Amino acid sequence: MQTTLKQQRASGRVSARQPFRSAAVARPRRSTVRVQASAAPLNDGLGFETMRDGIKVAAKETLLTPRFYTTDFDEMEQLFSKEINPNLDMEELNACLNEFRNDYNKVHFVRNETFKAAADKVTGETRRIFIEFLERSCTAEFSGFLLYKELARRMKASSPEVAEMFLLMSRDEARHAGFLNKALSDFNLALDLGFLTKNRTYTYFKPKFIIYATFLSEKIGYWRYITIYRHLQRNPDNQFYPLFEYFENWCQDENRHGDFLAACLKAKPELLNTFEAKLWSKFFCLSVYITMYLNDHQRTKFYESLGLNTRQFNQHVIIETNRATERLFPVVPDVEDPRFFEILNKMVDVNAKLVELSASSSPLAGLQKLPLLERMASYCLQLLFFKEKDVGSVDIAGSGASRNLAY
């Protein structure tokens, strides 16, 4: 189910699934996300539309763009209610809470005078693709902020410890979103996050699906950030903007968030040890991996501007994320079988043709898409039935597999 908050309010339909108060309650501090930017000649010819001076029109929503999520908050409350679940294992959850309270990055996201000067030196195609990267990243972080903030509000009475953890995660996500939106203003653009809150389409996921998906999102985010950071530390000439210097500490927020969501899953064994859990584990792994792989291959010029090979980078991130996920999920796809990435590479080629047809004004473009969509669906099915690994050795650190990876 996909609706905007504006449409829901207009129709008078209010549901526990929709985070209606997030627009009012979940608004971060003014200094965190509200920025101002003025249009500048450097952005002329890059193809960006503005709502008003310096405020960018959000990118069109597609299957691959960052989504805003909502869930059945009443059901989520029941999952972690102490009254309903008196034997809920809180030991690991409380350990995560103490980590969040430490707020290791409280003073990390402090800008310096190098940001704006560096932004003014980024021009042409590199400028365009980096602005797109900042927008997508900001939107994804802000989406997490809205979801976590509303979960914290709704669970405060039934499970105060879990609610506080979601609240502290929303603090981190707001910081990240604000930092990225401020970076956008260095490029003379910014997002109106309040407008996005009210007008973005919200995708409904059941509570357990939210936990699976956000766990994977946080863990893959960790590997993306740390991989880029380590690469640029070894190749400083490729670092054209100081944002990347913050990725080492930043990625630890993502890792801690993933650890908390892992603890949520372990506190509810039925989310990990049933046949249904095996099916959903593999499905969400594939969904996250496919989305990232196709997205990034549409933006190879961004990774090339950092001196990265897009294909090697993506495969490294997926392999490492999968290895981390093996310690928790009962089943994961065998991504280290070379045939796995062979199928993904075929999907990249088909997706490129679909993108080209979407931009075409030809009246036959819709018909020309049909065989490509059929081929894409067949590749998805191949991956769904692809060789899998029965794993789930929870809390076993590391991996005995040899690591001949690019980064």
Curated annotation (Swiss-Prot):
Residues 1-10 have a biased composition (Polar residues). Pathway: Porphyrin-containing compound metabolism; chlorophyll biosynthesis. One of its GO terms (biological process) is chlorophyll biosynthetic process. InterPro entries: AcsF (IPR008434), Ferritin-like_SF (IPR009078), Rr_diiron-bd_dom (IPR003251). The keyword Nucleus does not apply. Its cofactor is Fe cation. Residues 1-28 are annotated as: Disordered. It is an enzyme of class 1 (oxidoreductase). It holds the Pfam family Rubrerythrin. CDD domains: ACSF. Its main location: plastid. Keywords: Chlorophyll biosynthesis, Chloroplast, Iron, Membrane, Metal-binding, NADP, Oxidoreductase, Photosynthesis, Plastid, Thylakoid, Transit peptide. Induction: Induced in absence of copper and oxygen. Regulated by CRR1 protein, which activates its transcription in absence of copper. Its EC number is 1.14.13.81. GO terms for molecular function: magnesium-protoporphyrin IX monomethyl ester (oxidative) cyclase activity; metal ion binding. It comes from the Eukaryota. It catalyses: Mg-protoporphyrin IX 13-monomethyl ester + 3 NADPH + 3 O2 + 2 H(+) = 3,8-divinyl protochlorophyllide a + 3 NADP(+) + 5 H2O. It is found in: Plastid, Chloroplast thylakoid membrane. GO terms for cellular component: chloroplast thylakoid membrane. Belongs to the AcsF family. Catalyzes the formation of the isocyclic ring in chlorophyll biosynthesis under oxygen- and copper-deficient conditions. Mediates the cyclase reaction, which results in the formation of divinylprotochlorophyllide (Pchlide) characteristic of all chlorophylls from magnesium-protoporphyrin IX 13-monomethyl ester (MgPMME). This is Magnesium-protoporphyrin IX monomethyl ester [oxidative] cyclase 1, chloroplastic. It comes from Chlamydomonas reinhardtii. The lineage of its organism: Eukaryota, Viridiplantae, Chlorophyta, core chlorophytes, Chlorophyceae.
